[in-house]
């Protein structure tokens, strides 16, 4: 029987707030423009992977925020609507960038998947060969 510690909303909000504060500081000091939210996600992911923060310390607030994610995108949608004049002026360029970026993303994802699957296949073949060699050694037949 395992007991799971329940963390208060306030402690979870403090963890998220501290990470966002750190990511805002990092974003202002970077030489390239990068959204602080992306930096915050990377920091949170790293802290979870390194087990500095346990999942249960941020899980319920993360789940709640995921539940209202559509509402959180409303300001972005409004700013896109407000920018229709600029978007109409540069429609072809914007569409070209979107299409090219999508094709590049699909190609890189496909190549990476093939690389990983090919590596996995090779490891499977190597494992089979190793088992055959080890079987031969058990029976006194060394090649």
UniProtKB/Swiss-Prot annotation:
One cellular component term from this protein's GO annotations in UniProt: plasma membrane
Q: What is its main location?
A: membrane
How is this protein positioned relative to the membrane? Answer: Multi-pass membrane protein
The alphabetized UniProt keywords are:
Cell membrane, Cytolysis, Membrane, Transmembrane, Transmembrane helix
Q: Where are the transmembrane segments?
A: 6-26, 30-50, 61-81, 97-117
Where, subcellularly, is it found? Cell membrane
Q: Membrane: present as a keyword of the record?
A: yes
User: What Pfam families does the annotation carry?
Assistant: LrgA (PF03788)
- Disulfide linkage: none
Which Gene Ontology BP terms does the record give?
Answer: cytolysis; killing of cells of another organism; programmed cell death
User: What does this gene product do?
Assistant: Inhibits the expression or activity of extracellular murein hydrolases by interacting, possibly with LrgB, with the holin-like protein CidA. The LrgAB and CidA proteins may affect the proton motive force of the membrane. May be involved in programmed cell death (PCD), possibly triggering PCD in response to antibiotics and environmental stresses.
Family label = Belongs to the CidA/LrgA family. LrgA subfamily.
Sorted alphabetically, which NCBIfam families does this protein's record hold?
A: PRK04125.1
Per its record, how is this protein called by name? Antiholin-like protein LrgA
Q: Which organism is it from?
A: Bacillus cereus (strain AH820)
Q: Which gene encodes it?
A: lrgA
């Amino acid at each position: 029987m395992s007991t799971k510690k329940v963390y208060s909303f306030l402690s979870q909000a403090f963890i998220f707030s501290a990470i966002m504060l750190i990511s805002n500081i990092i974003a202002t000091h970077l030489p390239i423009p990068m959204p602080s939210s992306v930096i915050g996600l990377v920091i949170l992911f790293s802290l979870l992977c390194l087990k500095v923060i346990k999942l249960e310390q941020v899980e319920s607030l993360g789940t709640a925020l995921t539940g209202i994610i559509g509402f959180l995108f409303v300001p972005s949608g409004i700013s896109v609507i407000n920018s229709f004049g600029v978007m109409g002026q540069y429609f072809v360029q914007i569409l070209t960038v979107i299409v090219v970026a999508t094709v590049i993303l699909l190609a890189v994802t496909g190549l990476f998947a093939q690389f990983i699957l090919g590596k996995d296949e090779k490891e499977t073949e190597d494992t089979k060969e190793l088992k055959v060699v080890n079987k031969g050694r058990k029976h006194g037949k060394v090649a």
